[in-house]
Amino acid sequence: MAFQEILESLGGMGRYQVIHVVLLSLPVFMLASHNLMQNFTAATPSHHCRINGTYEETNFTGPWLRALLPMTPTGEFSKCLRYTTPQYELLENNLTQSYDDLETEPCLDGWVYDHSEFASTIITQWDLVCNHRRMRQVAQSIYMAGVLVGSILFGGLSDKFGRRPLNIWSNLQMFVTGICAAFSPNYIWYCIFRFLTGVAFSGIVLNSYSLTVEWIPTGNRAFTSTATGYCYTMGQLVLVGLAFIIRDWQWLQLAASIPFFFYFLYSWWIPESGRWLVLSGKPEVACKALKKVAQINGKKEAGEKLTVEILKSSMQREINASHNSTYSALDLVRTPVVRRISFCISCTWFSTSFAYYGLALDLQSFGVSIYIIQIIFGTVDIPAKFISYFITTYVGRRVSQAITLILAGIAILVNISVPQDFQTVRTAMAVFGKGCLAASFNCLYLYTGELYPTVIRQTGMGLGAMMARLGGIIAPLAQMTGDIYHSLPLIIFGCLPILSGIAGCFLPETLGVPLPETIEEVESPDKQQKDVNVSAKIPLKETELYNMKTDV
């Protein structure tokens, strides 16, 4: 880790690193807003068919509605049908529900919405109800598809063109596409701009992540990565505050997008990764950047002693390794032990993200204030991640991973048997499940990095991230299965984490085990004799940088 030694000699975690981390962490607050924004911008208010005539359209409880709208088996007014002609005899007879043989028709004149909680949403803007209600979930899946495409696209581009230019571009793209989404003329254009916003989301996450960890000394990554991870958690609370103040979806979309213009402006000041510059054949530029870091950190004399020759000599081993790498994604399934790890870790990544977004993007189903439930869902991540840290450090990674997933699945399944009237119990179980899933995320980033050997570690992390994105794409679509059976979404969201938790039991434990360097060491762990009594904190330090991306 020669580059890390150079950073230590130039001030370690100095003034420059603090400013650097703060500037790269600020966008994370608003990234949470875009990820979970549809809880508010796509909220579905109470609605019913528009009735021609002089009736009070804004009155959703008036007795006159019984003469105009049929009632469902649950005793509620139909949201998608109306009588072809007013049935005033229903009022006179004081009946509780309509006759089955009365003629009805769909909402030919549109719908009337209750604007008491939401002034405007994409649902009310484009009438995404009744036969078009599935478009709500489709829009979120399209956004998550953009996140997946962005992770694939920017992952390769950042290695070729650098982290800094792509971070600048991603902030600009997030600003522009976010603004365009707010002024979309129709649903199709809205989905297109949301897809591009998702692409930009991944660009910011991946490149700001790399820029952060590649300028931070190894010994300080635990604190900085954890602090940055909590920025996303706090960002969920920022979203609640914005949504509570701004009840119009277009203005809320603007409020969450405009800050990225300021991030774009100051991102020009953030220098390129020094390590990437050296490995890309630009040691002169890297040396200049390091001298600037030394000056800001008050280590000007140490910076003046640094030369291009010293820099290249110190990093010669890393330079040679980057030029001689011959490993590919096929190595994730080529050998039996690594293949088993890849299968089990793919299941855990997919199910964690799948169930997490299945809960986090369906807040209206709990029957309580959407603002209160979002606050609770956001704050539960704080103790969940804290507890997860201690369990993974002192009990074990495998135990932590399996328990959190199984408990999350059980909590979700319990809600199937809890009546809708027991809102407090249902909410408590959902919050507990969401907290377990947040803890699972926290463990996964660490565990995955320790399971794979150094030569394919980043490839393995990429596989996990891809499976998580797939889970995020499918989660909104799985909610549509409620049309088949009302509890089917909960059954799916609950069973998959339990099955994945069981699959996680077949993964090897990595607590106190030195990080493997080669595939052979993973396949034959008995031959790995590198100080088997090493402290559990050593593998943690090597892979703690992954914690920064938790839940993002």
Curated annotation (Swiss-Prot):
Question: Which keywords are on file for this protein?
Answer: Cell membrane, Membrane, Transmembrane, Transmembrane helix
Record keywords: Zinc included? no
Q: Which InterPro entries match?
A: MFS_dom (IPR020846), MFS_sugar_transport-like (IPR005828), MFS_trans_sf (IPR036259), Orgcat_transp/SVOP (IPR004749)
Chain ranges sitting on the Cytoplasmic side read 1-16, 159-164, 207-225, 272-336, 379-398, 448-459, 509-552
Disulfide bond as UniProt keyword: no
PTM annotation = Glycosylated. Glycosylation is necessary for proper targeting of the transporter to the plasma membrane.
Write out the annotated subcellular location: Cell membrane; Basolateral cell membrane; Basal cell membrane
User: What Gene Ontology terms describe where this protein resides (cellular component)?
Assistant: basal plasma membrane; basolateral plasma membrane
Report the transmembrane regions from the record.
17-37, 138-158, 165-184, 186-206, 226-246, 251-271, 337-356, 358-378, 399-419, 427-447, 460-480, 488-508
Tell me which Pfam families the record gives: Sugar_tr
Tell me where on the tree of life, at the top rank, the source sits: Eukaryota
How does the UniProt record describe the way this protein sits in the membrane? Multi-pass membrane protein
For this chain, one GO molecular function annotation is: transmembrane transporter activity
Which PROSITE patterns does this entry report, sorted A to Z? MFS (PS50850)
Which residues are on the Extracellular side of the membrane? 38-137, 185, 247-250, 357, 420-426, 481-487
Question: Chief subcellular site?
Answer: membrane
Known function: Involved in the renal elimination of endogenous and exogenous organic anions. Mediates the sodium-independent uptake of p-aminohippurate (PAH), cidofovir, adefovir, 9-(2-phosphonylmethoxyethyl) guanine (PMEG), 9-(2-phosphonylmethoxyethyl) diaminopurine (PMEDAP) and edaravone sulfate. PAH uptake is inhibited by furosemide, steviol, phorbol 12-myristate 13-acetate (PMA), calcium ionophore A23187, benzylpenicillin, furosemide, indomethacin, bumetamide, losartan, probenecid, phenol red, urate, and alpha-ketoglutarate.
Q: Which NCBIfam families match?
A: 2A0119
Tell me which PANTHER family the record gives: SOLUTE CARRIER FAMILY 22 MEMBER (PTHR24064)
Q: Give the similarity note.
A: Belongs to the major facilitator (TC 2.A.1) superfamily. Organic cation transporter (TC 2.A.1.19) family.
Q: What is this protein called?
A: Solute carrier family 22 member 6-B
Q: Please name the source species.
A: Xenopus laevis
